[in-house]
Amino acid sequence: MKKRIILGMTGATGAIYGKRILEVLKAQGGFETHLVVSDAGALNIHYELGIKRGALGELADQVHRIDDIAAPIASGGFKTEGMIIAPCSMKTLAAIAHGFGDNLISRAADVVLKERRRLVVVPREAPLNLAHVRNMVSLTEMGGIIYPP
């Protein structure tokens, strides 16, 4: 059975990170990837990589709509190895740190944390203000991993 990994891509710059993660997981084999791209993430994918969301989705095994809160990845019963959010906007990081599951990325991240699975976020912001740092601390205390690029 393949290991399931969720990849969220948000509106922060650095779409290449998410694309490369999908490429590497596909090349390695043994992984079932579930991709969720926010609307702002889709814009950045287009601006930074010159491709549409659908073209990126071809690298994933499953693509879920950002507004599909009923998707399987929004349930703790859907077993995964964890989730990576790359790039992760400060908005998404704040939503996760405060339990605000208003879309499928933040909801899936909430589920990953409550099920004690790995959540890795790749924040793309500099410099950081105090709210950013506090949200990163909160997410780390909840079991998340902050992985700056």
Predicted regions and their residues:
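A cross-family phosphate/adenosyl-ligand binding-site feature
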Residues: 1-120, 126-149
